[in-house]
């Protein structure tokens, strides 16, 4: 499967569309003979500096590694905030706000108590990041080749949504067991303090169901979140380079490009938090309680209940998403991976729409 995907990816429209236009000679007739030759020479040099080919197995593997770092490290870094957010969701009478939640946690558990659940967070979200970013690149290449160059451009937002949803479906299966353990450790005082204590206890009480009963609500939370995360990020980057950044992306330094990545990531993160928060509340309560179903929890929480802890989640997810995209893009820069620019309208489509002479 992966070999066929790699073969398709080499020809897909996201594989450096700017360079492809020059190579095909589509922009040649309007330029003197010398500049096009120089452009082709520079384009070739740019391709040669990459450590691997776009769509190759090495490319996808390194993208997955970037996902491991971006998701695993960032989620672990905000464990204290995540812990307070989860406790606000499952016990709103006791934890009435962010600062109140931190105060109570410090008083009852001490500073070390704020780090509860760091191990399942690191393991679970590293596995999720591997699948999320790695499979996103795979599905985006696969779907774009099915659509063709013109439809890929016209339906690019739908492409981002479909690719990210497909990737997140598999990513959540990898995340679910560790997410269940994390919530138990963070929200049930005295249940377990470490991952090694929680896993055997959960298995003894409920079997495998303890680890996967939350996968459906996890899909409810994470798939809309990831669809918004990737689609909003891709379109925001495109808009920033088009309307905000005063020069073309090709003329920006790597550092300037990474700043654009961070800003676009934060904007995407705010929308992600809002879209996914109700399901996040259900997941937190469901993993705390034994024998409950998602529909029962949703009915009990009500409309106001599912929005508890939203402000904390906006701060956490906005920062998380910005850092994740920054780290992911930095990994691509460090390993010299192909980083195609935002898509441009194909010349064939411009001619059909009468935008060229």
UniProtKB/Swiss-Prot annotation:
GO terms for biological process: mitochondrial phosphate ion transmembrane transport. Coiled coil: none annotated. Keywords: Acetylation, Membrane, Methylation, Mitochondrion, Mitochondrion inner membrane, Phosphoprotein, Repeat, Symport, Transit peptide, Transmembrane, Transmembrane helix, Transport. Signal peptide: none annotated. It catalyses: phosphate(in) + H(+)(in) = phosphate(out) + H(+)(out). The modification N6-acetyllysine is found at residues 94, 204. One of its GO terms (molecular function) is phosphate transmembrane transporter activity. Gene3D superfamilies: Mitochondrial carrier domain. Its main location: mitochondrion. It is a multi-pass membrane protein. Residues 46-58, 137-156, 234-256, 329-357 are mitochondrial intermembrane. Pfam families: Mito_carr (PF00153). Residues 1-45 form a transit peptide. The keyword Lipoprotein does not apply. The chain crosses the membrane at residues 59-81, 117-136, 157-178, 214-233, 257-279, 310-328. The modification N6-methyllysine is found at residue 107. Residues 82-116, 179-213, 280-309 are mitochondrial matrix. Solcar repeats lie at residues 58-142, 155-239, 256-334. It is found in: Mitochondrion inner membrane. Interacts with PPIF; the interaction is impaired by CsA. Belongs to the mitochondrial carrier (TC 2.A.29) family. PANTHER family: SOLUTE CARRIER FAMILY 25 (MITOCHONDRIAL CARRIER PHOSPHATE CARRIER), MEMBER 3, LIKE-RELATED-RELATED, SOLUTE CARRIER FAMILY 25 MEMBER 3. Inorganic ion transporter that transports phosphate or copper ions across the mitochondrial inner membrane into the matrix compartment. Mediates proton-coupled symport of phosphate ions necessary for mitochondrial oxidative phosphorylation of ADP to ATP. Transports copper ions probably in the form of anionic copper(I) complexes to maintain mitochondrial matrix copper pool and to supply copper for cytochrome C oxidase complex assembly. May also play a role in regulation of the mitochondrial permeability transition pore (mPTP). This is Solute carrier family 25 member 3. It comes from Mus musculus (Mouse).
């Amino acid at each position: 499967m992966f070999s066929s995907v790699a073969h398709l990816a080499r020809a897909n429209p996201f594989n450096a569309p700017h360079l492809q236009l020059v190579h095909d000679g589509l922009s040649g007739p309007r330029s003197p003979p010398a500049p096009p030759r120089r452009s082709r020479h520079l384009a070739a040099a740019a391709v040669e500096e990459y450590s691997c080919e776009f769509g190759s197995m090495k490319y996808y593997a390194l993208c997955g590694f970037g996902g491991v770092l971006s998701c695993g490290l960032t989620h672990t870094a905000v464990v204290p905030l995540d812990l307070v957010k989860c406790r606000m969701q499952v016990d709103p009478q006791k934890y009435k706000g962010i600062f109140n939640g931190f105060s109570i946690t410090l008083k009852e558990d001490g500073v070390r108590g704020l780090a509860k659940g760091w191990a399942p967070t690191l393991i679970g979200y590293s596995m999720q990041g591997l699948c999320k970013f790695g499979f996103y690149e795979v599905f985006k290449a696969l779907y774009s080749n099915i659509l063709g160059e013109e439809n890929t451009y016209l339906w690019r937002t739908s492409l981002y949504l479909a690719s990210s949803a497909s990737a997140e479906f598999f990513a959540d299966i990898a995340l679910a067991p560790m997410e269940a353990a994390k919530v138990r450790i963070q929200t049930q005082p005295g249940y377990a303090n470490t991952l090694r204590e929680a896993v055997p206890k959960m298995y003894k009480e409920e079997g495998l169901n303890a680890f996967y009963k939350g996968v459906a609500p996890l899909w409810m939370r994470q798939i809309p979140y990831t669809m918004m995360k990737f689609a909003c990020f891709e379109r925001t980057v495109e808009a920033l380079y088009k309307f905000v950044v005063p020069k073309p992306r090709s003329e920006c330094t790597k550092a300037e490009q990474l700043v654009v990545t961070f800003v676009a990531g934060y904007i995407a993160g705010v929308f992600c938090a809002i879209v996914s928060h109700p399901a996040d509340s259900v997941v937190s309560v469901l993993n705390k309680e034994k024998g409950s179903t998602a529909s029962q929890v949703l009915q009990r929480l009500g409309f106001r209940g599912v929005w508890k802890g939203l402000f904390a989640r906006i701060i956490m997810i906005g920062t998380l998403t910005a850092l994740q995209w920054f780290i992911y893009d930095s990994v691509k820069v460090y390993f010299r991976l192909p980083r195609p620019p935002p898509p441009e309208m194909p010349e064939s489509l411009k001619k059909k729409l009468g935008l060229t002479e």
